[in-house]
Structure formats: structure tokens, C-alpha cells
């Protein structure tokens, strides 16, 4: 049976045809413009067509967890009459429901357009759910939504209810009757778009229409959006709203601005009073970032947590000699440098990680000899990552609004009745959110105690004296990075917390917590496999490190009893790319953000840090959040790594050579590392043939192991220097040494088109794939993150996007949905375990899945591959079954009966009901199994040889298996099959 079913000639023809179509479409625009919401909403129609065209829908898809580390919670809503029942929103994992205090959960949002949730609200009396799509935490993976969704049948179906240009929603509050308020933050990465929806919106007709009540024009910044909203439960016309002025770019994040502020309305939003004036005691608003609101209705007391981006006042130096800082060397003369205190210089060099050979004596000498300029010491530290933390800012502060509310129209302190802001604490709240308060904004007040306040950042802190003093209430089993808190109004000791590690519940005010992490909602960045038998799966997660577990994992509670969770934690931080040395399947390369990698071996205990360094006098290296690494499949002592330059090690990372210059467009001023390599791959057919891609849209190829490089960038619609696409994958083919695939992603420009290019001539010419101008076979309007190619079957590709997984039989020319049971979740990484023919799918929100490709790969022929639409019902002869004594008996007291299983490989030509019959030589039906709603495509049909009479199982002998559609439309197929005697 042919495995290389699609000839090179056929594939080349498809690529040329794709190129022609792409050329016609590509001329329409050469800019990376934000994608219109209408195009994003049309993805639903594209998805339906690709689902109907799928020929892999019947393959076995299984979730392999893990669950224990969970994922980022953004909101929850608790049943006021039964606090054991609540609904949870995960940032990219959808909406889940529990009725047993978090012991078990059921998903409610799996079949919508997307899984990205920012806020939710539940009408518990009517069992209605409102979901605001797109979280507001402004992280690197805070995906944009398409507005508000509504379910009136408890999540069975969902209706879109507008605000499609809001992108990110921070709060939903239900009003009386059919009223609803929404705090819409607006796009994360783009400004100056009049169609965007930012601010406080209100609807009185269940979202059929919306009225804008407040936006940033009130503060002179229309780009500011709404991050939080309070509706006074005692006076529903009394509102508090917080606006946030933030701008994110690939290279920079401005966390605050003059548009950030707090507003109050006493007429349902018809008019507003600005409360964030400095004359009311509010910190200077030019540098105010995200805020969160908490209101005690009975006491009429408003608390606010503020991200104060103003520079922290410098502390007085205790020592006679002040500590040196990198910026001190800017503009310093040689004479001034020579006058420095040698001990202070030595401390500076040691504290900032300068190379060992760069001690104070040698640096003094090199500067005196003119070999080194003093500014080189500042340049050595001058990467963008350092700019994220310097200079130090004030950070989190808690304020309380005291005195009476401002009356409508009274907008100055003299008009007010003594109302003003007071900072609740004298000492600063250091180490609450460090330099990234934009990620939190959590504050809550106990409904039964106006002086008990809880705030969240990295730690979870409680105050019982109105915010004057604070103590931690998180325990060792509570994850850091907190986003939501609920305090039971009838039992204040009962608290539910949502964080980056899922849900925690306490019944004693925080002394003890229970982790409620049964949903598989892990946010994976990367996955890998080894070659052990059975093989193991590796994955790196957002804020949850790197883990390894069995490919046959099945979720269950057994580990609670044994204490042996099937997955092992290998590394901490944000887990990034993984490589495994398959010579021993124990030497593993893992890392966390910004290029900090290590090599470890759990059996030998070996562990080494891997991080190529620049030398004093060189321009600092720039490292991407997800730094690419690649272990050569030709020689597994060879490890490749990319900063903005290319690094190679010939000894498993013990020593690195920097072989290239800058392979990006160069650095860009900002506080986020940019101009970095994001993708790296070596040809599986030629040792040393390499490709790299960058975050600013460049692709470079090397034929000689990295010594020389040539730019070979596909003609993606980029507009350098500001609007460039991010290269997410460079992939050399298993089937042609000159074939290279490249994917681009425009997420960081709110540009959501799919870009997949292929070259059959080593990057000399390129063709765009998956964009044939039709809904039927093109990729949907979703950015591409990952691509995988089958080693066994030429032309078989899998593409992971921000909305799911798609498959192609013809090298990427046409596409279909890979599997309907995979949620509409971002797929960040793909890898095929070639020995087992299993596709491992790393999702950013629903953990890891495995798709069994064996029926597809084993069942394909060249004719079938080139014309799958014309295929008829077919089946293979299953392996004979060996009879065993004890079929149907329980293995132990109350265990499940031992049931024999037979796998029948088949191709199902259309969705529907099918039947397998087991017959004797006289065509008497002895056994039968009916399959309801089978998907189209290749699959294994599992059945047990039970007698239709119910009297046990068939005896050893020769039988006929018949397969047919239940309505008879496909005809009937028969094969001979046997149950054989058990050997002695």
C-alpha cells in the first residue's frame, strides 16, 4: 500500500495553483490592517463548511490532560441560594459549571465561535448566562473576542448579542428586567479606529441594542476603555466605573495614561462625575494604569486598587559610596570612570552578571587603554527585558473614597462635601504586582464587614482594618497571580479564589484551601514527545512550568489515593520549548521566558544552565518570550538556539558559538524585547540546512550549519518597520530537501488572517496556501501558530490556529476541520509521534490532546488521497480475535467485566448511522452493533463479539462481518473474520 500517496508533481501543481490565486487576492492590500469584526464572525460559516468537508472526524481523539496545574481564571458567578454551585470563566478555556463546590465541572461554552472569555454574569432565577468574550489582563496571550454572547438554555446554545468591536470585556453586570451593563475595554494592539467599542454600555432589550454611557472622551482620551464597573445594589442608578488607558505593541507596553480614571453616576449613566482629580487626593493621573473597584453598599464605601506607574522615589543611600547603576555610565568620560570607587565597580559587575573575566581591574585597564568606552557597561545591560523593570515604579496602591458622594454637577473639591481619596496604608505595597500590575486589578470587600478587604496580585492579601495593614491568606497549595475573589455574604469564612492555577476554595477564611482543578484547561505554549515505549508527552505552560506525562494518560481521581500524579514537573516559570534526546529519552532541554534554558536528566541528576551570553563591548542579545531551540535529529549532541542571532552548541549546550549577525530588522525602542528570533528548524533530510524566522517578519536560510545566511522571506503583506507579521513556524519537509513551509501571525496587530507559505526551491519562490478565496476549502480567518507534516504520508499537513486544528491531504492547498470534538481553542504547538502515528496537540486553554492517525495512514491509497470526495464505504479485515476464558467476568469483586474489543478499520463516506453484523456461514445474524451519528472519514469502529441473544460471547470459529449504513444507502460490505482458539 502506498504511503507517499501524493506525488511531487501533483503537489507542485497545487502550489503553483495556490500561488496564482494568492497573487490575485494579495494585490488588494499590502498592509497589515486590523481585521473587521464581520470577517471574524463569518468564521462560523467557514467552520461549518470545513466541518462538513472533514475526512478525519472519525479518528480517535482523546484528552490526555494534565489537569492538576489548571489554567487562568478570569471571572466566576456564584448561585446566591446555593454557594456550592458556581460558574467559572477561564481566559482561553471557556466556561465551566459546578454544583458540588468544585469537585466536578461540566463545560458550557465549547461549541461557540471561540473560547476566549473576559467576564460573565448569570441570572440564576431564569438560568440565563451572559459571556463577554476577550479577557482584559493584557498578557501576551490575551485573545480578542467578538462581543457578548447570551444563552437562555444553560449553555446548550449561544446567541451573539453585539459589541463585536469591543475585543476585550472586563465586567458584565445584570440590571433590573432585561437590562445589562458591559464594561468594554477595546482592542489591545490598535488605536485610532472609530468603529471600536470602548467604554460603559447599557442595554434594556437583552443586547438587541446598546447605548454608550461613558468612554474615554470624558477624560480627553477616546482610546481609553472600561475595565471595571460597580452597580449599587441599593440604588441601581448609582454607578462607579473605571477606565484604563493602555497601549500594547509587539515591542512596547504603555500600561497607563491620562485616560485612566474613576467616574461616578447617580442617574444610570446619563451623566458622570470625574473622581480621579489630584485635588481629591488621587495620584497624578498621567501615569495611572489599571484599576479595580470594590464597593460596600451598606456602608456606601468605595475601595480602589491602583496601578501607580509613577516612578518610585529614590531611597537615601545608607553607605558613603552610592551603588552604581547602568545609567550612571551614560555620557561618562574616561577621567570620571577612572575616579570611580573600585569596590563599587566590583559590586556593580558582580550584581549585574558580567562575565567573570570582566572584573574591576580588567575593566579599569580596558577603559584606560581606550579599548572600551564607559557606556559599554550600560549597553551590556541595555536589553528590552531590563527596561521592563527599570526604573522602579510605585506599583499597587489601595485608596478609599471618604465622605459623601459628589452631587451631580459639582466637579471641584470646593463644591464637594469633604469627599476625597485616602491611601489606606502608610507603607508601600511592595512585591504585590512588581512591574506588571496590568495583569491584576483584583480587590474585594467583605459584604458583611466594610473593613475586611482582599487584594490580589502575585500574592493574595487580606486586611481587616480597612486596608491599613495586610497579611497573606494564600497557602502552599494556592497558585500565585490572582484574578478573582468571591466572599460569601452569608458566611464570610467561605471564599472562592480564581488565579493562574485555577480555582481554590476555603471554608475557614484562608487558613486552609482546596484546589478544584479537575478541568483540563492548561495553557500550553509548546509540546514535545520522546521515543520511549510507551512514549511520553512533554509540555510547557503559561506560568505553570514544564511537565512530562504518559501518552496514555486518562483523567481520574486514583492519584488522590496513591499520591502519584502521572505527570511530573520538570521546570518552573513559564514553560517554553522542549527538546528530548531520544538516544536515552531522559536528557531533556527545557526553559522559561526570555531564553533561560537548562539541560537535565532525571536519572543521572545532571543539570546545566544554557544561555548564550554576549561579551562586554558587544550589543546585548535580544531574547523572545518563547525563545526557539532545536536539537538536531542528525546528531543529538548538536543544539541550536536563537536570540536575535543564531547560536550553536556541539556538546549538548555546554558551550555555544554565536555564528550569525543580527537576523532581524534590528532593535526597536520599547520595554518588550523585539527584533528576536521566534522560529528555528533544521531539515530532517540534510544536516546543517537551517531556517529561522523572526518576530519582525523575516526568514533566513543557512545551507552550512549557520555559518552563512541569506534572507528568503515569503511575500507576506508587511509594512516595515511598524507593521510586520510574526513568524510562528519554519518547517522543512520530510519529503523534499528543498521544500520549506513558513507561517505568519498578525495577532499583535489585531490582524487575524491566516498566512501559510510553501517553497519547493529552497525559498527562491513562494506560494501562499490555504487561501483559495472560498469558504469551502480555505483556512478560516484565524492566525496560524503551528504546522506539522506527516513523515509517512506526503502532503498530509495539520495546521493549528487561534481557533482550532485543520487538516490537509494535498500539501495545504485545501483544508478541512481536523475533528469536531476538539474545542475551538488556540492550538499553539503540534508534533507527530511517528512510530505510533499519533498527533499531539498542545492547546492554550484546554491542555493536551492526541489524535490517532493510524486508520488514516494505513487506509490511504494514492487514488483515495487525490479524490477523497469520491470515496465509498470501505473497510479492512480486522485482526482475528483470540478466545479467552473469562470473557464477561469481573476481574475482582466489584470491578468492571472483562469485555473483548475488536477494531474494524473503515472509511465512512457520509455522516450518519451505521451497523456492524456478525454472521455465521448460513448468514444468520449472531451479533450486531449499531453506531449512531458516525462522522465522515477514516476511523476504527470498536465492537464486542456479543451474541444478540445476550447469552455471552461468540465461540471460536469462522464468521462474516458485514458493514452497512442503517438506511441501506451505502450498500453492504462483508469480510471473513475468525475467533481462534487460545493456545496452550
Locate predicted features.
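Bacterial N-terminal signal peptides
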Residues: 8-18
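Sec/Tat signal peptide C-region and signal peptidase I cleavage site
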Residues: 20-23
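Beta-propeller blade termini and top-face loops
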Residues: 25-892
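Beta-strand-rich binding/interaction modules
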Residues: 600, 911-927
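Glycine-centered tight-turn motifs at strand-turn-strand junctions
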Residues: 778-780, 925-953
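Contiguous beta-strand segments within globular domains
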Residues: 885-911, 940
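A short tyrosine-centered beta-strand micro-motif
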Residues: 914, 939, 957-961
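C-terminal tail/sorting-segment detector
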Residues: 963-984
Amino acid at each position: 500500500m502506498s504511503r507517499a500517496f501524493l506525488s511531487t508533481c501533483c503537489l507542485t501543481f497545487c502550489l503553483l495553483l495556490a500561488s496564482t490565486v494568492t497573487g490575485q487576492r494579495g494585490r488588494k492590500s499590502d498592509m497589515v490592517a486590523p481585521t473587521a469584526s464581520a470577517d471574524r464572525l463569518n468564521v462560523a460559516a467557514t467552520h461549518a463548511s470545513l466541518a462538513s468537508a472533514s475526512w478525519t472526524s472519525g479518528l480517535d481523539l482523546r484528552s490526555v490532560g494534565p489537569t492538576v496545574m489548571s489554567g487562568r481564571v478570569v471571572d466566576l458567578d456564584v448561585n446566591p441560594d446555593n454557594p456550592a454551585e458556581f460558574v467559572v470563566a477561564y481566559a482561553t478555556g471557556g466556561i465551566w459549571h459546578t454544583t458540588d463546590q468544585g469537585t466536578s465541572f461540566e463545560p458550557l461554552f465549547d461549541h461557540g465561535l471561540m473560547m476566549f472569555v473576559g467576564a460573565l454574569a448569570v441570572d440564576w432565577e431564569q438560568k440565563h448566562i451572559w459571556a463577554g468574550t476577550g479577557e482584559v489582563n493584557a498578557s501576551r496571550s490575551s485573545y480578542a473576542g467578538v462581543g457578548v454572547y447570551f444563552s437562555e438554555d444553560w449553555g446548550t446554545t449561544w446567541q451573539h448579542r453585539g459589541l463585536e468591536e469591543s475585543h476585550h470585556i472586563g465586567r458584565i453586570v445584570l440590571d433590573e428586567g432585561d437590562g445589562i451593563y458591559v464594561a468594554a475595554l477595546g482592542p489591545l494592539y490598535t488605536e485610532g479606529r472609530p468603529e471600536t467599542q470602548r467604554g460603559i454600555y447599557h442595554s434594556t432589550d437583552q443586547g438587541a441594542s446598546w447605548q454608550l454611557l461613558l468612554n474615554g472622551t470624558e477624560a480627553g482620551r477616546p482610546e481609553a476603555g472600561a475595565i471595571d464597573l460597580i452597580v449599587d445594589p441599593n440604588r441601581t442608578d448609582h454607578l462607579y466605573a473605571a477606565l484604563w488607558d493602555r497601549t500594547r505593541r509587539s515591542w512596547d507596553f504603555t500600561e497607563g495614561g491620562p485616560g485612566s480614571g474613576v467616574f461616578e453616576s447617580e442617574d444610570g449613566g446619563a451623566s458622570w462625575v470625574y473622581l480621579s482629580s489630584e485635588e481629591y487626593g488621587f495620584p497624578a493621573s498621567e501615569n495611572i494604569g489599571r484599576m479595580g473597584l470594590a464597593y460596600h453598599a451598606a456602608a456606601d464605601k468605595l475601595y480602589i486598587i491602583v496601578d501607580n506607574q509613577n516612578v518610585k522615589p529614590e531611597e537615601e543611600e545608607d553607605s558613603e559610596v552610592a551603588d552604581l547603576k547602568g545609567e550612571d555610565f551614560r555620557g561618562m568620560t574616561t577621567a570620571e570612570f577612572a575616579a570611580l570607587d573600585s569596590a563599587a565597580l566590583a559590586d556593580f559587575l558582580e550584581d549585574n552578571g558580567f562575565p567573570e573575566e570582566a572584573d574591576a581591574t580588567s575593566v579599569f585597564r580596558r577603559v584606560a587603554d581606550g579599548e572600551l568606552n564607559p557606556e559599554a557597561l550600560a549597553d551590556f545591560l541595555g536589553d528590552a527585558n531590563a527596561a521592563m523593570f527599570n526604573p522602579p515604579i510605585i506599583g499597587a496602591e489601595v485608596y478609599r473614597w471618604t465622605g459623601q458622594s459628589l452631587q451631580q454637577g459639582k466637579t471641584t473639591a470646593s463644591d464637594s462635601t469633604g469627599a476625597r481619596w485616602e491611601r489606606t496604608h502608610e507603607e508601600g505595597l511592595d512585591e504585590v504586582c512588581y512591574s506588571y500590575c496590568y495583569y491584576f486589578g483584583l480587590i474585594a470587600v467583605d459584604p458583611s464587614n466594610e473593613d475586611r478587604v482582599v487584594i490580589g496580585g502575585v500574592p493574595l492579601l487580606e486586611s481587616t482594618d480597612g486596608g491599613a495593614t495586610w497579611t497573606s491568606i494564600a497557602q502552599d497549595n494556592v497558585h500565585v497571580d490572582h484574578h478573582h475573589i468571591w466572599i460569601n455574604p452569608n458566611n464570610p469564612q467561605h471564599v472562592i479564589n480564581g488565579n493562574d492555577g485555577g480555582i481554590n476554595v476555603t471554608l475557614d477564611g484562608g487558613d486552609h484551601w482546596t484546589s478544584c482543578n479537575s478541568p483540563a484547561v492548561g495553557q500550553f505554549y509548546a509540546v514535545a514527545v520522546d521515543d520511549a515505549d510507551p512514549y511520553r508527552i512533554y509540555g510547557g505552560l503559561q506560568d505553570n512550568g514544564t511537565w512530562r506525562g504518559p501518552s496514555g494518560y486518562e483523567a481520574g481521581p486514583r492519584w488522590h489515593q496513591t499520591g502519584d500524579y502521572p505527570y511530573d514537573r520538570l521546570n518552573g516559570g513559564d514553560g517554553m520549548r522542549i527538546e528530548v534526546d531520544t538516544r536515552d529519552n531522559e536528557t531533556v532541554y527545557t526553559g522559561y521566558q526570555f531564553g533561560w534554558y537548562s539541560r537535565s536528566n532525571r536519572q543521572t541528576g545532571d543539570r546545566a544552565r544554557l544561555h548564550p551570553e554576549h561579551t562586554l563591548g558587544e550589543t546585548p542579545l535580544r531574547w523572545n518570550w518563547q525563545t526557539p531551540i532545536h536539537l538536531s535529529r542528525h546528531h543529538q549532541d548538536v543544539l541550536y538556539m536563537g536570540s536575535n542571532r543564531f547560536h550553536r552548541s556541539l556538546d549538548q549546550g555546554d558551550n555555544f558559538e554565536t555564528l550569525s549577525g543580527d537576523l532581524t530588522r534590528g532593535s526597536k525602542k520599547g520595554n518588550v524585547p523585539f527584533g528576536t528570533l521566534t522560529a528555528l528548524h533544521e531539515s530532517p533530510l540534510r544536516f546543517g540546512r537551517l531556517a529561522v524566522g523572526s518576530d519582525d517578519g523575516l526568514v533566513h536560510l543557512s545551507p552550512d550549519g549557520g555559518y552563512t545566511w541569506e534572507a528568503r522571506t515569503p511575500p507576506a503583506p508587511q509594512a516595515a518597520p511598524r507593521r510586520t507579521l510574526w513568524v510562528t513556524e519554519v518547517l522543512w519537509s520530510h519529503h523534499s530537501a528543498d521544500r520549506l513551509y513558513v507561517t505568519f501571525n498578525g495577532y499583535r496587530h489585531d490582524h487575524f488572517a491566516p498566512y501559510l507559505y510553501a517553497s519547493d526551491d529552497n525559498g527562491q519562490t513562494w506560494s501562499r496556501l490555504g487561501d483559495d478565496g472560498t469558504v469551502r476549502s480555505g483556512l478560516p480567518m484565524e492566525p496560524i501558530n503551528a504546522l506539522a507534516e506527516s513523515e509517512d504520508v506526503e502532503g498530509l499537513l495539520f495546521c493549528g490556529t487561534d481557533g482550532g486544528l485543520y487538516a490537509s491531504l494535498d500539501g495545504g492547498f485545501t483544508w478541512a476541520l481536523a475533528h469536531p470534538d476538539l474545542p475551538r481553542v488556540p492550538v499553539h504547538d503540534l508534533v507527530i509521534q511517528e512510530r505510533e502515528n499519533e498527533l499531539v496537540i498542545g492547546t492554550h486553554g484546554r491542555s493536551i490532546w492526541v489524535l490517532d492517525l493510524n486508520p488514516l495512514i494505513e487506509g490511504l491509497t494514492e487514488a483515495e488521497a487525490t479524490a477523497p470526495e469520491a470515496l465509498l464505504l470501505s473497510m479492512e479485515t480486522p485482526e482475528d480475535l483470540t478466545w479467552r476464558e473469562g470473557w464477561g467476568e469481573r476481574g475482582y469483586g466489584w470491578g468492571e467485566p472483562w469485555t473483548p474489543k475488536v477494531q474494524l478499520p473503515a472509511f465512512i463516506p457520509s455522516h450518519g448511522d451505521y451497523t456492524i453484523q456478525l454472521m455465521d456461514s448460513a448468514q444468520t445474524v449472531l451479533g450486531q452493533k449499531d453506531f449512531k451519528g458516525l462522522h465522515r472519514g477514516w476511523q476504527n469502529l470498536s465492537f464486542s463479539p456479543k451474541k444478540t441473544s445476550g447469552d455471552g460471547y461468540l465461540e471460536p470459529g469462522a464468521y462474516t462481518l458485514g458493514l452497512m449504513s442503517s438506511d441501506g444507502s451505502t450498500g453492504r460490505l462483508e469480510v471473513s473474520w475468525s475467533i481462534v482458539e487460545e493456545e496452550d
